[in-house]
A protein has these predicted regions:
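Cap/lid segment of the alpha/beta-hydrolase catalytic domain
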Residues: 48-50, 57, 83-229
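Catalytic nucleophile loop
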Residues: 232
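Structural motif
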Residues: 14-22, 75-82
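Short loop/turn segments that connect beta-strands within beta-propeller blades
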Residues: 23-26, 85-86
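Beta-propeller fold detector
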Residues: 30-47, 90-97
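Short beta-strand elements that form the blades of beta-propeller/WD-repeat-like
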Residues: 3-11, 63-72
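Repetitive beta-architecture junctions, highlighting loop-to-beta-strand starts
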Residues: 4, 16-18, 40, 65, ...
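Short flexible coil/turn linkers enriched for glycine and charged/polar residues
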Residues: 12, 61-63, 74-75, 118-121
Length: 232
C-alpha cells in the first residue's frame, strides 16, 4: 500500500501483471466500509511487450511520485525502472548489460495456445530470431525447434532473459516453452490439475503443444527436439 494507491501483483493469461488501484482519499471511511469501498481507477503497467515479467522493487517512501519496479522478458534483459504516477512514463534506471552487441529488435516472442485432449487451453511461449519462421506470421515456415516443459510444484516458467539461449536462436533454432498443468502459470487450479492422480495431464499437455506447433507449421517432427526433467 502506498499513499493514495495500492500496487497489486496478479496473473493474467499465464503472465505476471502489476496493477495500480487508486484510492478515493478525499472522503472519510464510513462505518461498515473497508478499503475496497475506497477503490477507484485501476491501471495496469504495460512495458510495451507481448510477454513480460514484472514485479515491485524496493519502495521505502510510500508518498514518492515514482514507483520502483523491475521487469524483463525472453528478449529484454532484467531491467529496473521507475513508473511516474503523474503521466505513466516508464523511466529505465538500470538494465543488465549483454556483451557482444546484443540487439533485442532482432528477436521476437509470442504467445500461442494449444488445446489439450480434455479441451483445456495450454499456453505456449515461442521465442525466435526474426525471420526464423519466414516473413508471413500467418503461414510460418517450419524451423528447428526445442520444446521445453516442466509442470510441477506450482512453479511458473515466466518470461526471463538467457544469454546462453542466443547461441541457438542465432543459428536458426526456435524455443517453445509449454506451460503445462502442474506449474503455477494459470493459478492454483493449474497446479492441482497436474499432480497426484491428475499428473498425466502434465504429459498429455506437452504432447498437445508439440502437435499444435507441428500442425501450425512452426516445425516438423524431424526438426523438433524436447527437453524436460526432474519432477516435471
Amino acid at each position: 500500500a502506498f499513499t493514495g494507491y495500492l500496487a497489486v501483483s496478479y496473473r493474467k493469461e499465464a503472465l505476471p501483471r502489476l496493477r495500480l488501484i487508486f484510492l478515493d482519499t478525499e472522503r472519510a471511511v464510513k462505518p461498515g466500509e473497508t478499503l475496497v469501498d475506497l477503490c477507484g481507477e485501476m491501471q495496469d503497467i504495460d512495458v510495451g511487450e507481448e510477454l513480460f515479467n514484472i514485479g515491485i522493487h524496493a519502495n521505502p517512501e510510500p508518498a514518492a511520485p515514482l514507483l520502483r519496479l523491475s521487469y524483463g522478458s525472453f528478449i529484454t534483459p532484467p531491467t529496473v525502472a521507475d513508473y511516474r504516477l503523474s503521466d505513466g512514463a516508464l523511466i529505465i534506471r538500470k538494465q543488465a548489460e549483454v556483451q557482444g552487441g546484443y540487439d533485442p529488435s532482432r528477436y521476437e516472442q509470442k504467445r500461442l495456445w494449444a488445446t489439450a485432449s480434455d479441451g483445456e487451453r495450454i499456453p505456449i511461449s515461442l521465442i525466435a530470431r526474426k525471420g526464423t519462421h519466414g516473413e508471413d506470421p500467418y503461414r510460418p515456415t517450419p524451423a528447428p525447434l526445442l520444446l521445453y516443459g516442466y509442470g510441477s510444484y506450482e512453479d511458473s516458467r515466466d518470461p526471463g532473459f538467457s544469454v546462453s539461449r542466443l547461441s541457438y536462436l542465432d543459428r536458426g533454432m526456435a524455443l517453445a516453452i509449454a506451460h503445462v498443468r502442474g506449474g503455477g502459470e494459470m493459478g492454483r487450479r493449474w497446479y492441482d490439475d497436474g499432480k497426484l492422480e491428475k499428473k498425466p495431464n502434465t504429459f498429455t499437455d506437452f504432447i498437445a503443444c508439440a502437435d499444435y506447433l507441428i500442425a501450425e507449421g512452426y516445425t516438423t517432427p524431424a526438426q523438433m527436439v524436447a527437453n524436460g526433467g526432474s519432477a516435471g
